[in-house]
Amino acid sequence: MDSGKIKLNFSTIIHQLSYVNAMNKNIYFFGMLSFYFMLQFQTTSAQVYINQAGYLPTLPKIFYTSVSADSFYVIESSTSIIKYRDELYFSVANDPATGLTLYAGDFSTLENIGNYFIYLSNGDSSQTFPISSTVLDDVYKKSLKGYYFQRCGTVLLQPHAGVYYHAACHPGDGFYHSSTGQSGFRLTTGGWHDAGDYGKYVVNSGITVGTLLLADESFPDKFNHDNSNIPESGNGVPDLLDEVRYELEWLLKMQNDNGGVYFKTTKEQFESFIMPQNDSGIRYIHVLSSTATGNFAAMMARAARLYNSIDTTFSNKCLNAATLAWNYLIANPTIVPTGGFKNPTGTVTGEYGDTNDSDERLWAAAELF
Protein backbone atom coordinates (compact mmCIF):
# COMPACT_ATOMS: atom_id res chain seq x y z
CA MET A 1 0.00 0.00 0.00
CA ASP A 2 1.35 3.45 -0.85
CA SER A 3 1.01 5.01 2.59
CA GLY A 4 1.36 1.82 4.57
CA LYS A 5 -2.15 2.31 6.02
CA ILE A 6 -4.84 -0.28 5.38
CA LYS A 7 -8.38 0.94 4.77
CA LEU A 8 -10.74 -1.74 6.01
CA ASN A 9 -14.23 -0.23 5.84
CA PHE A 10 -16.98 -1.09 8.28
CA SER A 11 -19.08 -2.82 5.62
CA THR A 12 -16.24 -5.29 5.14
CA ILE A 13 -16.47 -6.23 8.80
CA ILE A 14 -20.21 -6.80 8.46
CA HIS A 15 -19.53 -8.92 5.36
CA GLN A 16 -17.14 -11.09 7.38
CA LEU A 17 -19.91 -11.78 9.88
CA SER A 18 -21.73 -13.86 7.28
CA TYR A 19 -19.14 -16.59 7.80
CA VAL A 20 -20.06 -16.98 11.45
CA ASN A 21 -23.16 -18.63 12.89
CA ALA A 22 -25.59 -16.56 14.88
CA MET A 23 -24.49 -17.94 18.27
CA ASN A 24 -20.98 -16.56 17.85
CA LYS A 25 -21.97 -13.37 16.03
CA ASN A 26 -21.41 -10.99 18.94
CA ILE A 27 -18.02 -12.45 19.79
CA TYR A 28 -16.94 -12.33 16.15
CA PHE A 29 -18.27 -8.80 15.70
CA PHE A 30 -16.15 -7.38 18.50
CA GLY A 31 -13.16 -9.44 17.36
CA MET A 32 -13.43 -8.05 13.85
CA LEU A 33 -13.98 -4.55 15.20
CA SER A 34 -10.72 -4.85 17.14
CA PHE A 35 -9.01 -6.14 14.01
CA TYR A 36 -10.37 -3.17 12.08
CA PHE A 37 -8.83 -0.67 14.50
CA MET A 38 -5.53 -2.58 14.50
CA LEU A 39 -5.35 -2.26 10.72
CA GLN A 40 -5.82 1.50 10.83
CA PHE A 41 -2.44 1.84 12.55
CA GLN A 42 -0.63 -0.92 10.68
CA THR A 43 2.47 0.02 8.65
CA THR A 44 4.25 -1.61 5.75
CA SER A 45 7.45 -3.17 7.07
CA ALA A 46 10.74 -3.90 5.36
CA GLN A 47 10.94 -6.92 7.64
CA VAL A 48 8.25 -8.88 5.78
CA TYR A 49 10.00 -10.55 2.84
CA ILE A 50 7.79 -11.63 -0.04
CA ASN A 51 8.32 -12.39 -3.71
CA GLN A 52 7.36 -8.98 -5.07
CA ALA A 53 7.15 -10.37 -8.60
CA GLY A 54 4.32 -12.51 -7.30
CA TYR A 55 3.38 -16.16 -6.96
CA LEU A 56 2.04 -18.69 -9.44
CA PRO A 57 -1.36 -20.07 -8.35
CA THR A 58 -0.48 -23.76 -8.02
CA LEU A 59 3.12 -23.47 -6.80
CA PRO A 60 4.40 -23.03 -3.21
CA LYS A 61 3.90 -19.60 -1.64
CA ILE A 62 6.25 -18.84 1.23
CA PHE A 63 7.21 -15.54 2.84
CA TYR A 64 9.72 -14.78 5.57
CA THR A 65 9.95 -12.26 8.36
CA SER A 66 12.41 -11.35 11.07
CA VAL A 67 9.47 -10.36 13.28
CA SER A 68 8.44 -12.85 15.96
CA ALA A 69 4.69 -12.53 15.48
CA ASP A 70 2.20 -15.28 16.29
CA SER A 71 0.10 -15.40 13.15
CA PHE A 72 -0.37 -13.87 9.74
CA TYR A 73 -3.24 -12.99 7.44
CA VAL A 74 -3.33 -12.84 3.65
CA ILE A 75 -5.61 -9.94 2.77
CA GLU A 76 -7.05 -9.11 -0.63
CA SER A 77 -5.88 -5.56 -1.32
CA SER A 78 -8.94 -4.41 -3.28
CA THR A 79 -11.50 -5.50 -0.68
CA SER A 80 -9.48 -5.80 2.57
CA ILE A 81 -11.09 -9.22 3.04
CA ILE A 82 -9.05 -11.86 4.83
CA LYS A 83 -8.49 -14.74 2.42
CA TYR A 84 -6.15 -16.88 4.50
CA ARG A 85 -4.87 -17.14 8.06
CA ASP A 86 -2.22 -19.32 9.65
CA GLU A 87 0.55 -19.43 12.24
CA LEU A 88 4.15 -18.42 11.57
CA TYR A 89 6.76 -21.10 12.11
CA PHE A 90 10.43 -20.84 12.98
CA SER A 91 12.65 -21.12 9.91
CA VAL A 92 16.31 -20.52 10.77
CA ALA A 93 18.50 -18.76 13.31
CA ASN A 94 21.37 -16.62 12.06
CA ASP A 95 20.49 -17.17 8.43
CA PRO A 96 23.84 -17.28 6.57
CA ALA A 97 22.61 -14.98 3.81
CA THR A 98 21.21 -12.25 6.06
CA GLY A 99 22.41 -12.88 9.61
CA LEU A 100 18.78 -12.70 10.73
CA THR A 101 16.60 -15.07 12.68
CA LEU A 102 13.75 -15.80 10.31
CA TYR A 103 10.20 -17.04 10.63
CA ALA A 104 8.14 -18.28 7.70
CA GLY A 105 4.55 -18.31 6.63
CA ASP A 106 3.09 -20.75 4.11
CA PHE A 107 -0.04 -19.84 2.18
CA SER A 108 0.40 -22.29 -0.69
CA THR A 109 -3.22 -23.43 -0.58
CA LEU A 110 -4.41 -19.94 -1.55
CA GLU A 111 -4.71 -20.20 -5.34
CA ASN A 112 -7.23 -17.47 -6.18
CA ILE A 113 -5.91 -14.95 -8.70
CA GLY A 114 -5.70 -11.44 -7.26
CA ASN A 115 -3.57 -8.87 -5.45
CA TYR A 116 -2.80 -9.41 -1.78
CA PHE A 117 -0.65 -8.33 1.12
CA ILE A 118 0.55 -10.09 4.27
CA TYR A 119 -0.56 -8.70 7.62
CA LEU A 120 1.21 -9.90 10.78
CA SER A 121 -0.50 -10.10 14.15
CA ASN A 122 1.96 -7.52 15.53
CA GLY A 123 0.76 -4.91 13.01
CA ASP A 124 3.47 -5.14 10.34
CA SER A 125 2.55 -5.87 6.75
CA SER A 126 4.11 -6.52 3.36
CA GLN A 127 3.96 -4.70 0.08
CA THR A 128 1.17 -5.75 -2.26
CA PHE A 129 1.90 -8.76 -4.48
CA PRO A 130 -0.06 -10.66 -7.16
CA ILE A 131 -1.07 -14.29 -7.44
CA SER A 132 -1.39 -14.94 -11.15
CA SER A 133 -0.47 -17.40 -13.87
CA THR A 134 1.33 -14.55 -15.69
CA VAL A 135 3.50 -13.17 -12.88
CA LEU A 136 6.70 -14.23 -14.63
CA ASP A 137 5.79 -12.70 -17.99
CA ASP A 138 6.82 -9.23 -16.88
CA VAL A 139 9.97 -10.60 -15.24
CA TYR A 140 10.92 -12.26 -18.52
CA LYS A 141 10.30 -9.15 -20.62
CA LYS A 142 12.27 -6.92 -18.28
CA SER A 143 15.13 -9.41 -18.10
CA LEU A 144 15.29 -9.64 -21.88
CA LYS A 145 15.08 -5.86 -22.21
CA GLY A 146 18.12 -5.65 -19.97
CA TYR A 147 20.25 -7.02 -22.81
CA TYR A 148 19.01 -4.25 -25.09
CA PHE A 149 20.22 -1.68 -22.55
CA GLN A 150 23.66 -3.35 -22.68
CA ARG A 151 24.01 -2.90 -26.44
CA CYS A 152 27.29 -1.35 -27.51
CA GLY A 153 28.07 0.67 -30.61
CA THR A 154 24.54 1.83 -31.34
CA VAL A 155 22.11 4.56 -30.38
CA LEU A 156 19.55 3.54 -27.77
CA LEU A 157 16.48 5.39 -29.00
CA GLN A 158 14.09 7.00 -26.54
CA PRO A 159 11.01 5.11 -27.84
CA HIS A 160 12.77 1.87 -26.89
CA ALA A 161 15.04 2.93 -24.03
CA GLY A 162 12.93 5.57 -22.30
CA VAL A 163 14.98 7.55 -19.77
CA TYR A 164 17.96 5.28 -20.48
CA TYR A 165 18.38 6.45 -24.07
CA HIS A 166 21.87 7.53 -25.13
CA ALA A 167 24.01 8.24 -28.18
CA ALA A 168 26.10 5.59 -29.89
CA CYS A 169 29.18 4.51 -27.98
CA HIS A 170 32.60 2.95 -28.63
CA PRO A 171 32.80 3.45 -32.40
CA GLY A 172 36.55 2.81 -32.31
CA ASP A 173 36.51 -0.87 -31.28
CA GLY A 174 39.18 -1.96 -31.53
CA PHE A 175 42.97 -1.89 -31.88
CA TYR A 176 45.18 -4.94 -31.57
CA HIS A 177 47.04 -5.04 -28.28
CA SER A 178 50.77 -5.45 -28.73
CA SER A 179 50.56 -8.81 -26.95
CA THR A 180 48.70 -10.22 -29.97
CA GLY A 181 51.75 -9.77 -32.19
CA GLN A 182 49.54 -7.81 -34.56
CA SER A 183 49.06 -4.10 -35.12
CA GLY A 184 46.43 -1.77 -36.46
CA PHE A 185 42.65 -1.66 -36.27
CA ARG A 186 40.07 -4.45 -36.46
CA LEU A 187 36.37 -3.60 -36.47
CA THR A 188 34.83 -5.18 -33.37
CA THR A 189 31.91 -2.83 -32.75
CA GLY A 190 28.58 -4.08 -31.46
CA GLY A 191 27.71 -6.75 -28.93
CA TRP A 192 26.82 -6.26 -25.28
CA HIS A 193 28.68 -4.42 -22.57
CA ASP A 194 29.72 -6.80 -19.83
CA ALA A 195 28.11 -6.47 -16.40
CA GLY A 196 29.13 -3.18 -14.78
CA ASP A 197 31.92 -2.27 -17.16
CA TYR A 198 31.92 -1.53 -20.87
CA GLY A 199 34.29 -4.31 -21.89
CA LYS A 200 33.22 -7.20 -24.12
CA TYR A 201 34.37 -10.74 -23.30
CA VAL A 202 33.91 -13.85 -25.44
CA VAL A 203 34.05 -16.36 -22.59
CA ASN A 204 31.37 -14.44 -20.70
CA SER A 205 29.21 -14.51 -23.79
CA GLY A 206 29.45 -18.30 -23.77
CA ILE A 207 27.36 -18.83 -20.67
CA THR A 208 24.93 -16.03 -21.59
CA VAL A 209 24.32 -16.81 -25.25
CA GLY A 210 24.49 -20.54 -24.61
CA THR A 211 21.87 -20.38 -21.86
CA LEU A 212 19.49 -18.12 -23.78
CA LEU A 213 19.65 -20.28 -26.90
CA LEU A 214 19.22 -23.45 -24.83
CA ALA A 215 16.09 -21.94 -23.26
CA ASP A 216 14.65 -21.16 -26.69
CA GLU A 217 15.62 -24.54 -28.10
CA SER A 218 14.08 -26.39 -25.16
CA PHE A 219 10.87 -24.34 -24.79
CA PRO A 220 10.29 -22.47 -28.07
CA ASP A 221 6.63 -21.80 -27.29
CA LYS A 222 7.61 -20.01 -24.08
CA PHE A 223 10.01 -17.59 -25.77
CA ASN A 224 8.11 -16.56 -28.89
CA HIS A 225 7.33 -13.02 -27.66
CA ASP A 226 7.83 -10.38 -30.33
CA ASN A 227 6.65 -7.36 -28.36
CA SER A 228 9.47 -6.40 -25.99
CA ASN A 229 9.85 -2.93 -27.53
CA ILE A 230 13.30 -3.41 -28.98
CA PRO A 231 14.01 -2.05 -32.49
CA GLU A 232 13.39 -5.47 -34.04
CA SER A 233 10.06 -6.10 -32.29
CA GLY A 234 7.23 -6.92 -34.67
CA ASN A 235 9.44 -8.45 -37.36
CA GLY A 236 8.01 -11.93 -36.86
CA VAL A 237 11.14 -13.22 -35.11
CA PRO A 238 11.11 -13.88 -31.34
CA ASP A 239 12.75 -10.94 -29.59
CA LEU A 240 15.03 -13.31 -27.71
CA LEU A 241 16.58 -14.47 -30.99
CA ASP A 242 16.79 -10.90 -32.30
CA GLU A 243 18.61 -9.79 -29.16
CA VAL A 244 21.00 -12.74 -29.09
CA ARG A 245 21.79 -12.15 -32.75
CA TYR A 246 23.07 -8.68 -31.86
CA GLU A 247 25.70 -10.37 -29.69
CA LEU A 248 26.41 -13.10 -32.24
CA GLU A 249 27.18 -10.50 -34.91
CA TRP A 250 29.86 -9.05 -32.63
CA LEU A 251 31.25 -12.47 -31.84
CA LEU A 252 31.72 -13.18 -35.54
CA LYS A 253 33.95 -10.09 -35.73
CA MET A 254 36.18 -11.57 -33.03
CA GLN A 255 37.24 -14.59 -35.12
CA ASN A 256 40.61 -14.61 -36.85
CA ASP A 257 40.91 -16.01 -40.37
CA ASN A 258 42.69 -19.05 -38.88
CA GLY A 259 39.59 -19.91 -36.84
CA GLY A 260 40.90 -18.79 -33.47
CA VAL A 261 38.91 -16.25 -31.48
CA TYR A 262 40.26 -13.23 -29.64
CA PHE A 263 39.65 -13.18 -25.91
CA LYS A 264 38.14 -9.72 -25.34
CA THR A 265 37.84 -6.09 -26.41
CA THR A 266 38.49 -3.72 -23.49
CA LYS A 267 40.46 -0.72 -22.35
CA GLU A 268 43.55 -1.29 -20.23
CA GLN A 269 41.76 0.11 -17.16
CA PHE A 270 38.15 -0.06 -16.09
CA GLU A 271 36.26 3.09 -16.97
CA SER A 272 34.85 5.40 -14.31
CA PHE A 273 31.14 5.79 -13.61
CA ILE A 274 30.24 7.57 -16.84
CA MET A 275 27.75 7.10 -19.63
CA PRO A 276 28.99 4.78 -22.39
CA GLN A 277 29.03 7.47 -25.07
CA ASN A 278 31.41 9.48 -22.86
CA ASP A 279 33.86 6.60 -22.49
CA SER A 280 36.79 7.56 -24.68
CA GLY A 281 40.22 6.02 -25.02
CA ILE A 282 41.67 3.09 -26.90
CA ARG A 283 39.95 -0.27 -26.54
CA TYR A 284 42.16 -3.21 -27.29
CA ILE A 285 41.62 -6.62 -28.85
CA HIS A 286 43.46 -9.25 -26.82
CA VAL A 287 45.16 -12.49 -27.85
CA LEU A 288 43.64 -15.59 -29.41
CA SER A 289 42.39 -17.98 -26.76
CA SER A 290 41.33 -21.62 -26.91
CA THR A 291 38.75 -21.09 -24.13
CA ALA A 292 37.24 -18.24 -26.15
CA THR A 293 37.42 -20.37 -29.30
CA GLY A 294 35.70 -23.34 -27.65
CA ASN A 295 32.89 -21.16 -26.33
CA PHE A 296 32.58 -19.51 -29.73
CA ALA A 297 32.36 -22.83 -31.58
CA ALA A 298 29.62 -24.07 -29.24
CA MET A 299 27.59 -20.86 -29.44
CA MET A 300 27.79 -20.71 -33.22
CA ALA A 301 26.86 -24.37 -33.67
CA ARG A 302 23.79 -23.94 -31.49
CA ALA A 303 22.90 -20.69 -33.25
CA ALA A 304 23.14 -22.41 -36.63
CA ARG A 305 20.35 -24.78 -35.58
CA LEU A 306 18.06 -22.16 -34.12
CA TYR A 307 18.35 -19.56 -36.88
CA ASN A 308 18.10 -22.06 -39.73
CA SER A 309 14.34 -21.64 -40.09
CA ILE A 310 14.61 -17.84 -39.79
CA ASP A 311 17.64 -16.87 -41.88
CA THR A 312 19.47 -19.68 -43.66
CA THR A 313 22.27 -17.38 -44.80
CA PHE A 314 23.03 -16.33 -41.23
CA SER A 315 22.63 -19.92 -40.03
CA ASN A 316 25.20 -21.12 -42.56
CA LYS A 317 27.54 -18.30 -41.57
CA CYS A 318 27.34 -19.43 -37.94
CA LEU A 319 27.94 -23.08 -38.85
CA ASN A 320 30.94 -22.22 -41.01
CA ALA A 321 32.39 -20.10 -38.21
CA ALA A 322 31.84 -22.92 -35.70
CA THR A 323 33.55 -25.42 -37.99
CA LEU A 324 36.50 -23.08 -38.55
CA ALA A 325 36.84 -22.60 -34.79
CA TRP A 326 36.74 -26.36 -34.25
CA ASN A 327 39.50 -26.85 -36.80
CA TYR A 328 41.60 -24.33 -34.87
CA LEU A 329 41.09 -26.34 -31.68
CA ILE A 330 42.13 -29.54 -33.46
CA ALA A 331 45.24 -27.82 -34.79
CA ASN A 332 46.03 -26.53 -31.28
CA PRO A 333 45.38 -29.47 -28.94
CA THR A 334 46.80 -27.73 -25.85
CA ILE A 335 45.55 -24.59 -24.23
CA VAL A 336 46.19 -21.29 -26.02
CA PRO A 337 47.90 -19.17 -24.84
CA THR A 338 50.13 -21.53 -22.87
CA GLY A 339 48.87 -21.70 -19.29
CA GLY A 340 45.65 -19.91 -20.19
CA PHE A 341 44.84 -16.25 -20.72
CA LYS A 342 46.53 -13.72 -18.46
CA ASN A 343 46.20 -9.96 -18.63
CA PRO A 344 49.27 -8.34 -20.17
CA THR A 345 51.22 -5.86 -18.07
CA GLY A 346 49.24 -2.65 -17.67
CA THR A 347 45.83 -4.25 -18.23
CA VAL A 348 43.52 -4.85 -15.26
CA THR A 349 40.15 -5.52 -16.92
CA GLY A 350 38.44 -8.89 -16.46
CA GLU A 351 40.92 -11.74 -16.78
CA TYR A 352 38.69 -14.77 -16.26
CA GLY A 353 41.73 -16.99 -16.08
CA ASP A 354 41.32 -20.67 -16.88
CA THR A 355 44.15 -23.17 -17.11
CA ASN A 356 42.00 -26.01 -18.45
CA ASP A 357 40.05 -25.71 -21.69
CA SER A 358 38.77 -29.30 -21.82
CA ASP A 359 35.22 -28.28 -20.85
CA GLU A 360 35.04 -25.69 -23.64
CA ARG A 361 36.33 -28.27 -26.13
CA LEU A 362 33.76 -30.81 -24.91
CA TRP A 363 30.90 -28.32 -25.23
CA ALA A 364 32.00 -27.36 -28.74
CA ALA A 365 32.10 -31.02 -29.79
CA ALA A 366 28.69 -31.72 -28.24
CA GLU A 367 27.09 -28.83 -30.13
CA LEU A 368 28.79 -29.58 -33.44
CA PHE A 369 28.58 -33.35 -33.56
Question: What kind of feature is each model-predicted range?
Answer:
Residues 266-267, 283-309, 315-318, 325-369:
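Catalytic cores of eukaryotic secretory-pathway lumenal/extracellular enzymes that build
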